[in-house]
């Protein structure tokens, strides 16, 4: 039996009455965000708007992005990554569960020294893929060229943010590479593994 989204009490500063808000809105007010689904334009736009709004509201207090995602759309994930680099507050990324595919790209985009993985978290990197198989030859070639550009961009970001040589990152992206939290730390995707 689904319980829906829990409601929690919240009192705005300066207000006497407590109101009940859903737990996500309460956590947003504490600058905590959750990427707990496949990355698509809806969740991307929601996270981007929250980061921008809260960075305008207070640009010196860190934002926290908790990640448990199988990945998803590359362009939507890159939009989240770019916003994380654009906003003034540091964005701390915390992997709990799984950060796979474009979600691992978002994870590595957190502020250097502020990227964390829970002890039993898993991280997976690979090259971008497409499901555009039924296209005409010309469209297929254009799609392949775009995928190659995306792969080069993603590889360059991983190299820059992990400190690993380009040949290591390129080789790892050839297939699905799953890592434990400590392996992700050794790979430079996260800086710390949370203690139990």
Curated annotation (Swiss-Prot):
Keyword Amino-acid biosynthesis: no
Molecular function via GO: ATP-dependent peptidase activity; ATPase binding; serine-type endopeptidase activity
Any one GO biological process: protein quality control for misfolded or incompletely synthesized proteins
Active-site residues from the entry: 101 (nucleophile), 126
Family, per entry: Belongs to the peptidase S14 family.
Major place of residence: plastid
Self-association and partners: Component of the chloroplastic Clp protease core complex.
Gene3D superfamilies: 2-enoyl-CoA Hydratase, Chain A, domain 1
InterPro entries, alphabetized: ClpP (IPR001907), ClpP/crotonase-like_dom_sf (IPR029045), ClpP/TepA (IPR023562), ClpP_His_AS (IPR033135)
The species this protein was found in: Aethionema grandiflorum
Name of the featured protein: ATP-dependent Clp protease proteolytic subunit
Subcellular location: Plastid, Chloroplast stroma
Taxonomic placement: Eukaryota, Viridiplantae, Streptophyta, Embryophyta, Tracheophyta
């Amino acid at each position: 039996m689904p319980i829906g989204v829990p409601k929690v009490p919240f009192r705005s500063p300066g207000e006497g009455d407590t109101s009940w808000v859903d737990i996500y809105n309460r956590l947003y007010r504490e600058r905590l965000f959750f990427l707990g689904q496949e990355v698509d334009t809806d969740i991307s736009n929601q996270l981007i708007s929250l980061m921008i709004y809260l960075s305008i509201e207070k640009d010196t207090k860190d934002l926290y992005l908790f990640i448990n995602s199988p990945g998803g759309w590359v362009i939507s994930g890159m939009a989240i990554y770019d916003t994380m680099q654009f906003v003034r507050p540091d964005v701390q990324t915390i992997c709990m569960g799984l950060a796979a595919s474009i979600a691992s790209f978002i994870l590595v985009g957190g502020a250097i020294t502020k990227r964390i993985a829970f002890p039993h978290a898993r991280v997976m990197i690979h090259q971008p893929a497409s499901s555009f198989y039924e296209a005409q030859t010309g469209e297929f070639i254009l799609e392949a060229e775009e995928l190659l550009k995306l792969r080069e961009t993603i590889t360059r970001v991983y190299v820059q943010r992990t400190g690993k040589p380009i040949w290591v990152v390129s080789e790892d992206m050839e297939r699905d590479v799953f890592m434990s939290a400590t392996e992700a730390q050794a790979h430079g995707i996260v800086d710390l593994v949370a203690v139990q």
